[in-house]
Amino acid sequence: MRVLQAAVVILVSAAPVWPQAARLKTADAVLGRYQQALGGVAAIEKVQSETVRGEVEATGMAAKATFVYQAKPFKFVLRVKRPDGVEITQGFDGRISWVVTPKGASIDRDTAVEALRRDTDLQYALHQPDYFQKLELAGITDFEGHRCYWLHGTTHWGKDNNQYYDVETGLLVGYRFQADRLSPATATQLFQVYRSFGGPLVATTVTSRTGDRTQTFTYTSVSYEPLADSVFELPEAVKMLLK
């Protein structure tokens, strides 16, 4: 799923500490180290479905909402329940991105389908270069209070993207990128508090910041039980829009 203050990543003991002297020279080396920091290629490959539960807080929202996020490769459904009882459901079935609110259903026709597929790639840590025209190591820089390897690239759909990996731990600290919708806005996404729930390490606090608006998802549980394809079927209200 992208705070106005410097972020501190809380790392579990399972995250290896790499010697700073062994400076990495290529984007592939940085990404390979990230895969190992998460728990290794085999652990990442085992994730074929995912259910995440937690809370979300955002600018303009008086209290925290709760959410359930379910995903399989290239599909997802996100259900958010606000403190006032209002429910919002968003999803992607591999082709169509949609949202249903109390005001009705709508289809996202602005975001590139490849961007949506990237966001629902459960093995994205293994496939990152596949989504870029180019992705290169731009150097070492400070990002949100961390000394980071900085990767810079352009996606296949023409968006600028910057990734920051902690020099000490190899873990992803955050992104700074051009939004995937039609807006030219630059967004920042931070990944904090890494934990394992029986699979690869997961950032359990994910904060997205665009301008003066902030949204933070806090994960309380992550499970990898299989999910039926029916979970990701289009709601009837969305199907009506396609007729």
Name these PLM-found stretches.
Residues 115-150, 171-176:
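Short, conserved active-site entrance elements at the starts or edges of catalytic domains
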Residues 19, 81-83, 144-238:
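Gly/Pro-enriched, hydrophobic low-complexity segments
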Residues 98-124:
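Acidic/charged, solvent-exposed loop-and-adjacent secondary-structure segments enriched in E/D, K/R, S/T
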Residues 242-243:
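Short, solvent-exposed mixed-charge patches
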Residues 22, 29-105, 131-137:
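N-terminal mature ectodomain segment of secretory-pathway/periplasmic proteins
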Residues 2-9:
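Sec-dependent signal peptide recognition
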Residues 68-73, 93-96, 112-116, 166-168, ...:
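A short, sequence-level motif marking secondary-structure junctions
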